[in-house]
Amino acid sequence: MSPSTQSFIVDAALFDMDGTLVDSIAAVEKAWGNVAEEIGQDPEYVIAATHGKRAIDNLRQFKPHLKPEEMDNAVSQFEQTILDFADEYNKKTSSYQSSVISSPATMTPSSSAPSSRRSSRANSLFEQDAYDVKFRNQLSGFAIPESAIEEEAAVDGITEDIRAAWNAEHELIDRSVRILPGVRDMIDSIPEGRYAVATSGAKTYAYGAMSRVGIIPPQVTITACDKRLKAGKPAPDPFILAAECLGYDPKRCVVWEDSPSGIRAGVASGATVIAVCTSHTRDKISNCGAHYIVENMESVGCDVQPDGRLKFTITSDV
């Protein structure tokens, strides 16, 4: 297949955050799954219903008992749980590793080759046995004084400690925040003042997620708790406000989105919309009105024109 290119020029770029710039979907879904269990709803239903929408709108829907004066605190607490779930894996694996005897010959579960990290329980048990063998073989190269410990008891005891650490770590799910493909190059190619972030996340979550992957929130970052917003996505308000704060007409901007509600918000704002298939398959977002659909930002380049405007070039295989 030969590559095909399409280009257009705009004044500025407006980015959604989660699913577009960063991937924290696993932590978000875990947090909403907990809410679902708390209120006795099906987690899959709640997760699907909340995706791409503001936490405040979702909490109003699923926790109608919350009073208006309680809502800001409820949103802040909920979004902190997202960040806690995102940080949980790295914190606990670090703790497990530090609890195991440290020596040049000691391997921890995290330090084993990635190819050995299988997800099934059967494979996990196989890995543990193989790991025990490796560890025993490594210990065999060292002389353990009889006056200090009995060799076999020591090896068995250490092996059990490592097996326990393996079991604990293996049960964890890595929900850490990740930057998505092509994002760093895209952001670096756009001058300050020519792009903004408009997210359904409140400030705690939005700034926390971006900082975890090394993205400096732009001067114009519209979050769900912005009091100037009358409505969140799928209403166009977040993108319209972001464009206005940059000083541009939203119709002369490009919106980057990943979720159906966000794509519809971008279309309603009048902007050119690029949808990325980073959280939904192409068939799930193809009928939302996006002008272009790409796998991720690696398919798109941005060049600054002499007058400061942005030329986006989309490359696809045809």
Give residue ranges: language-model regions.
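Glycine- and other small-residue-rich loops at beta-strand/loop junctions that grip anionic moieties
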Residues: 172-176, 198, 231
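Residue-level detector of anion-binding/catalytic polar loops
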Residues: 42, 194, 272
